[in-house]
From Swiss-Prot:
Protein name: Trigger factor
Compositionally biased region (Low complexity): 486-503, 511-526
Species: Synechococcus sp. (strain JA-2-3B'a(2-13))
One Gene Ontology term of the molecular function aspect: protein folding chaperone
UniProt keyword annotations, A-Z: Cell cycle, Cell division, Chaperone, Cytoplasm, Isomerase, Rotamase
Record carries keyword Isomerase: yes
GO BP term, example: chaperone-mediated protein folding
Underlying gene: tig
Length: 556
């Protein structure tokens, strides 16, 4: 057998394969014998009918198709081994099957060509002796108050309002319908008893502003414009008229910030203790964010001189994974897996494709980073020791075992290995880089103090490694993994989100869960498995709701 290789765009390898006549004949004879042994012809025992009757019964075209299919499959597997190829896609023929059948002759050589996509290798330019600028993150005094106020807001009591119009900060219940610029109704945007918190950045731009000032039971037309990047392209940038009826207005009454409140939301006894703890956590988060900023700056500099030809198969896989991660927000809102699968299954194909297309640029960026780091690892012969890996795996397994969670050890081992390897290559790159630190205003500043004992460890998303849990798949989108913590709503400043996750207002536990103590490398989309929060892929975004600890009051 003769095999000729050629490089094709998109990390494809073209193969032209010529199979010698004697092998073609043997393959054809093998196909015939298999048919003879399995076909039942009246008047003959199975396997005993004359060949000419078998050919007549089965049909020459079917026999040829079976013979050609077997021959091609055997030939390409051998070609992969000889060429030392590890395909990541199916072999695609250059010619139509009918064309190959027409040229097939059991007594002659048989040739065909096609291609497969293979895992690409990045061509990295300069990665030693870099000079980069990184932003140092510092804790601002108001961040502690913002976190505490957010928890107070989550536990607010909702009080009915009847004597004034709606204002920012209220929670309202509305009915609404919608029509487009031509006056056509948009039935999918019609709903009743929709609860919405009146925040300037909530819902579709212009919608909240239109509700502010409305009186109870008032009906009003509100023009709102969808963002230009809205996932439904037919609505992106378009102005829609909503007919809104205001059913209820509720004002939020926040709990007093005292020791009793602190004891309710945490294991601390006093406000002072909570503030001291938050200060330390925010400082740690600021240091981590500074490190992440440095890693991002280094990776961006490396990518400027990195060339990689990404195959469409990898881009599709990464895009699908990002979309699955974005659906975590739905799980956090309390939507059950079955409901989520139903939601996905009912999405029109074009809508699903639009959702995936939104993640394509990020998918490409993540893949380029991963492949660039992989190339540096090979070039510099950076490795993870088996003892180091075993110790880390045991720590992760033990941490989750304490919570009664059963993990797949091999998958944990792979994730931990990738994380450790990423941490090692990033540490090596930092040692080779000159860093100019600046503050948030861009002014030169000192380097942040290194984290004490800061060994980067893999973050282990629970659903990534749960054993005996089949992965659901609807329209190519794996079931969204369940987030290990709930991010508080509202604007977040540097370090604030992580601190909020570490100290949820709805939990008393102060110590972080395993997913929090086992922190991921800041090199966002590199070698380790990681999660990243993304926008909820809902058509009409769900309103952020306060989380009162008591039922709505009818009055004070």
């Amino acid at each position: 057998m003769q095999v000729t290789q050629e490089k094709r765009p998109g990390s494809r390898v073209g193969l032209k394969i010529v199979v010698e006549a004697d092998r073609v004949k043997r393959s054809y004879e093998k196909t015939l014998r298999q048919l003879e042994q399995n076909i039942q012809i009246p008047g003959f025992r199975k396997g005993k009918a004359p060949r000419n009757l078998v050919v007549r019964q089965v049909g020459r075209e079917r026999i040829l198709a079976s013979a050609v299919d077997d021959l091609i499959n055997e030939a390409i597997q051998q070609a992969f081994k000889e060429a030392q190829l590890t395909p990541i896609s199916r072999f695609e023929l250059d010619d139509e099957v009918g064309q190959l059948l027409a040229q097939f002759n059991p007594e002659a050589d048989f040739s065909f060509s096609g291609y497969v996509e293979v895992y690409p290798e990045a061509r990295v330019g300069q990665y030693k002796g870099l000079t980069v600028t990184a932003t140092r993150v510092d804790v601002k005094p108001e961040q502690i108050d913002q976190l505490i106020d957010r928890w107070r807001d989550q536990r607010a009591t909702l009080l009915p309002v009847e004597d004034r119009p709606a204002q920012l900060g209220d929670v309202v219940v509305i009915d609404f319908a919608a029509r487009d610029a031509e006056g056509n109704p948009l039935d999918e945007m019609t709903t009743q008893d929709f609860q919405l918190e009146l925040k300037e950045d909530n819902f579709i731009p212009g919608f909240v502003a239109g509700i502010v000032g409305m009186q109870l039971d008032e009906t009003k037309e509100i023009a709102a414009t969808f963002p230009d990047d809205y996932f439904r392209k037919e609505l992106a940038g378009k102005t829609v008229t909503f007919i809104v009826c205001l059913r209820e207005i509720k004002a939020k009454e926040l709990p007093e910030l005292d020791d009793a409140f602190v004891q309710e939301i945490s294991s601390f006894q006093t406000v002072a203790e909570l503030r001291e703890h938050l200060q330390k956590r925010l400082e740690q988060d600021a240091l981590r964010q500074s490190e992440e900023n440095l890693e991002t700056a280094i990776l961006n500099a490396i990518l400027e001189t990195t060339e990689v030809d990404l195959p469409e198969t990898l881009i599709e896989q990464e895009t699908t994974q990002l979309l699955a991660q974005s659906l975590q927000a739905l799980r956090q809102e309390g939507i059950k897996p079955g409901e989520l699968r139903k939601f996905l299954s009912e999405l029109p194909p074009e809508t699903l494709n639009q959702l995936k297309e939104r993640h394509r640029p990020e998918a490409i960026d993540r893949l380029r980073r991963t492949l660039a780091l992989s190339a540096i690892v090979r070039q510099e012969q950076i490795a993870v020791g088996s003892t180091e890996l075993d110790v880390e795996v045991e720590e992760v397994m033990a941490a989750y075992a304490q919570q009664g969670q059963k993990l797949d050890r091999e998958r944990v081992r792979q994730a931990v290995y990738e994380s450790l390897l990423t941490n090692k290559v990033m540490a090596w790159l930092k040692s080779q880089t000159t860093v100019n630190w600046v503050d948030s205003e861009g002014n030169p500043t000192q380097a942040p103090t290194s984290l004490a004992g800061s060994e980067e460890k893999v973050e282990v998303p629970e659903a990534e490694f749960e054993a005996d849990e089949p992965e659901a798949e609807v329209s190519g989108i794996p079931e969204a993994v369940e987030s290990s913590s709930e991010t508080a709503t509202g604007a977040e400043t540097d370090g604030e989100a992580a601190a909020a996750e570490a100290e949820p207002a709805t939990e008393k536990a102060v110590e972080a869960s395993p997913a929090e103590t086992v922190s991921a490398s800041a090199a966002e989309a590199t070698l380790p498995v990681e999660e990243k929060a993304a926008e909820t892929a809902t058509e009409i975004p769900a309103a952020e709701k306060p989380k009162p600890s008591k039922k709505d009051k009818k009055g004070k």
